[in-house]
Structures are given as C-alpha cells and as structure tokens.
C-alpha cells in the first residue's frame, strides 16, 4: 500500500496547492482533506473488479474517480464532468500524476447514453439517488454495478428510490458499510463510509 499512499499524497499536495484558487475545495475543507475526501473515496475500491471499466459521474475535484484510479491501477476510469474549469483540473491532474488509466469526458451522464457502456458507475455528492439513477443506469452493461458514496441518509434514499430503481432495470439496492477503523483510528471520521450498491439486471 506504500506506493498507493504515496500517489494519494501527491494528489493531496495538488489539492492543497490548487484546490481553493480553482474553486474545488474551500479552505475549511483542507484540514479534513484526508478523512472526508481522500480516504472516504477509497471506500468504493473494494467493489470494483480487476480489469473493469468505470465511469465516475460528476467527478468534480476528483472524488472518488481520481482516487480510485490511483489506488486501483488495474482498472480504467472515465471521469465524467460537465463544467469546463473542473474538466481542465481533471486533465491537469491526469497529466501531472501520469494517470494512463484515466480519460476525461466533458459531458453530463445522460449525454453519454448509448455511447458509453461500463462495468461500474461510481459517484459522490451528485444528487439524491432517485434523481441519479435514471442518469447513470443506462451506462451499465448487464450485471454492471453502481457503487455510490452516500451519507447518513443512504438507507432512506434507497427507500425513496425503490420505484425508479425497478423502472431503470436495477436490482434492489443495499448499503455496504466500509469499516473506517484501522488500528483504532477512524480513517473516514466517526461513522463508516456508506456505499449504496445495486446491479443492472440482464436485459432479456
């Protein structure tokens, strides 16, 4: 994990240097950059199979997409982001960190329906699950999976999205809690990271 931790540290340095002036992270976020953003973003990595093609929707500053690309060099990640200044940031990061397993698409997820088919969709802090699902479900191949970072309302969002999950061809979703404690230290904060998971039901 040493090499991966070093890669995360390099990304952290870029965020500290550039994040505020590029409007990516406010100064109040910097003290909790590791716990709230970087390490929290690693929670999705255990749900991505080796060799997968991943779409990270609404990548913004790079959470969780850039983090996933750094800690899982065995997968390819498409960073989907509609805002020009954020797209430029993601292109710069991919260049500065020599991320050859990353490509950046300036688009909304729904603009890529029929053009992009992936094994896994990730995202964080984009929209409520009931709004998000119709945008991202069409990007999945059969048996492809959503792995979405959510907060304390994860279970409630699943309940609210039950009908749209079914209409979008997805199996019932569940919450996977990633234990944040390593050697007694809470890596992600006081609560576990919550990942909402579901998969695309094969189309007959």
Question: What are the language-model segments listed below?
Answer:
Residues 1-55, 71, 85-102:
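Class I SAM-dependent transferase core
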Residues 22-23, 31-32, 61, 124-127:
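Flexible, active-site-adjacent loop/turn segments at secondary-structure boundaries
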Residues 30, 65-67, 158:
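Residue-level recognition of conserved structural "scaffold" positions that shape functional pockets
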Residues 57-59:
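Conserved beta-strand/loop positions that form the S-adenosyl-L-methionine
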Residues 61-74:
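Conserved SAM-binding loop of SAM-dependent methyltransferases across substrates and taxa
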Residues 72-204:
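S-adenosylmethionine
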């Amino acid at each position: 994990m040493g090499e991966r931790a070093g890669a995360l540290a390099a990304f952290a340095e870029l965020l500290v240097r550039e994040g505020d002036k590029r409007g990516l992270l406010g100064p109040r976020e910097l003290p909790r950059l590791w716990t709230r953003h970087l390490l929290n973003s690693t929670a999705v990595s255990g749900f991505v199979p080796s060799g997968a093609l991943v779409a990270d929707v609404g990548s913004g500053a790079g959470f969780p997409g850039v983090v996933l690309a750094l800690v899982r060099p065995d997968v390819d990640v498409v960073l989907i982001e509609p805002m020009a200044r954020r797209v430029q940031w993601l292109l710069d990061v991919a260049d500065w960190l020599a991320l050859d397993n990353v490509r950046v698409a300036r688009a909304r997820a729904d603009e890529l329906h029929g053009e992009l088919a992936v094994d896994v969709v990730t995202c964080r802090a984009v929209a409520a699950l009931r709004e998000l699902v119709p945008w991202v479900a069409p990007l999945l191949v059969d048996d492809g999976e959503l792995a979405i970072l959510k907060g304390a309302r994860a279970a409630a969002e699943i309940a609210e999205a039950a009908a749209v999950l079914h209409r979008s061809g997805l199996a019932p979703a569940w919450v996977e809690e990633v234990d944040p404690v390593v050697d007694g230290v809470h890596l992600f904060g006081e609560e576990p990271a919550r990942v909402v998971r579901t998969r695309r039901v094969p189309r007959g």
